[in-house]
Amino acid sequence: MAEPTITTTYAGQFAGKYISAALLSPSTIDGGGVTVLPNVKFKEVLQNVATSALLANATCDFDAAGSTVTLTEKILTTNDLQVNMQLCKSQFFNTWQSLEMGASQFSDLPKSFQDYLLGYVAGKVASEMETTLWQGAAGAAGGLTDGGFTVLAAAQLPGANIIAPAAVTAANVIDELGKVVDKINAQTNIYGFEDTRIFVSRNIMAAYVRALGGFSVAATSNAGVDNRGTMWYADGGGVTFDGIKLFMAEGLPNDTMLAAQISNLYYGVSLLSDTQEARVIDVSQYDGSDNVRVVMRMAAGAQIGVASDVIYYGV
């Protein structure tokens, strides 16, 4: 079968499903770890409202003198991003053919070769965005204007809300998580809220799972959750610490944690913007090669709403 010649362009809202796959598929976003603002073209104003004591003794008059309302703002600025990738068409076309003919166990098949290529690239972008969302430097090429959440936290949080990290192992993970919860109670009022999370790196989650398996103490005195040892986590269920849910953020660097409410971490994207684009360009008809180029244009940014309500364990 001859290889197809394909040149396809999706622009504006028609590019949405491909840009959405790239921007909303990072594991943190897909798992509901942050608040997504879907239609930010350049800037979004995040308004914070603080009030003084509102209740007073009843009188016959209206008297607002005792109630003070303070409005502050944070700005979420998106950065225009692009993907320019050149792929050898024949290598991917063979894989796509096998998928179309049923030589695969996957049930969701690409309807066309360009869908397959765009899906492949979107998956790569999503993986890169997960890391950028958490630890990308401010203003870095291909990154976010103000940086990822750890960069924002290091720059915005009061010193009392930042904990110097240690090398976390199964032997000390309970103590290190305890430091975070102690700071939550001492410096914020977010304990007990349904959307409060402690976002942890992979190695911290692994250390905690092992610790709960009973191997951070004498095996004779602790056989782990339900006496199952490290097998207790076989179902992959969620875990908590001192009543707070843990969220494994794959983009966090090792030995890093961030405690916050989901409603206080913002991720802005341009899903509804007419400036986004997803394009597949077959250049074989122009230069005789067997190459196809994939182009995507989008925008994304991150911001913390109220910095004083966040605890950061990291550098």
Predicted regions and their residues:
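Intrinsically disordered or highly flexible coil/loop and linker segments, enriched in small
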Residues: 20, 24, 126-135, 190-193, ...
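Short, flexible loop/turn elements at secondary-structure junctions
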Residues: 89, 202-204, 250, 298
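Assembly/oligomerization interface modules of large self-assembling protein complexes
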Residues: 16-99
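Alpha-helical scaffold segments that mediate packing/assembly in large oligomeric complexes
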Residues: 98-183, 313
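Sequence/fold signature of self-assembling virion shell proteins
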Residues: 2-53, 146-171, 209-315
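Ordered core of a single globular domain
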Residues: 175-215, 219, 224
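Short helix/loop capping segments that flank catalytic or ligand/cofactor-binding pockets
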Residues: 95-96, 130, 207-209
